[in-house]
């Protein structure tokens, strides 16, 4: 194979990767899609909202949200999966995210893959989170390399735990999150699990 042929092959392979990354998932009311730069201000506003971040250690600054956005993009590129932006069909509004994320901190269920979600406060209470998470879960069932998923949240976060239950996950146990200080009220987490393969 000469250099020109090699170059064509690389370009072709690169195009395939881009197409895979830009696939999106539709539900009756939502689109789970690749991120756009215009999502970033809405993403930052969501991550700065104390209602949304009630069960996290801190709200995020604009700079921290942008760094988070970059990590999401990197995970799609390196793993082939990640956190999709969630868009409402009726008005194309950015609502938050739902998708998959590698578990890399020191726990007995790592390495593993987490299914997670975060929606802006104005979209709570309408069933959007379980609708998006169910669509992501069903898409994952078609991926032979992913056979199980985990989800977890701090014990007081009953809203998120209810989403885990609604999408068919099973409660496994409680655990101390190693990245939360030992004396912090959010250290105790609950872990859910589901088989996908």
Residue ranges of predicted features:
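Conserved GNAT-fold acetyl-CoA-binding loop/helix
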Residues: 51-72, 82-84
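Acyl-donor (CoA/ACP) binding surface of acyl/acetyltransferases
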Residues: 9, 17-41, 45-54, 87-197
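Short loop/turn motifs at secondary-structure junctions and domain boundaries
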Residues: 75-79
């Amino acid at each position: 194979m000469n250099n020109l042929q090699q170059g064509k092959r690389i370009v072709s392979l690169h195009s395939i990767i881009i197409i895979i990354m830009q696939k999106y998932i539709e539900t009756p009311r939502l689109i789970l899609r690749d991120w756009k730069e215009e999502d970033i201000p809405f993403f930052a506003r969501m991550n700065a909202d104390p209602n949304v971040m009630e069960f996290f250690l801190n709200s995020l600054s604009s700079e921290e949200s942008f760094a988070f956005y970059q990590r999401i993009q990197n995970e799609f590129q390196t793993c082939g999966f990640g956190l999709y932006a969630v868009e409402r069909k009726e008005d194309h509004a950015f609502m938050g995210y739902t998708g998959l994320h590698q578990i890399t901190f020191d726990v007995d269920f790592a390495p593993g893959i987490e299914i997670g979600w975060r929606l802006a406060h104005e979209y709570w209470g309408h069933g959007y989170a379980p609708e998006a998470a169910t669509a992501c879960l069903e898409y994952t069932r078609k991926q032979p390399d992913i056979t199980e998923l985990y989800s977890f949240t701090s014990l007081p976060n009953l809203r998120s735990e209810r989403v885990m239950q609604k999408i068919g996950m099973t409660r496994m146990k409680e655990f101390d999150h190693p990245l939360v200080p030992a004396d912090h009220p959010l250290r105790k987490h609950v872990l859910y699990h589901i088989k996908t393969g």
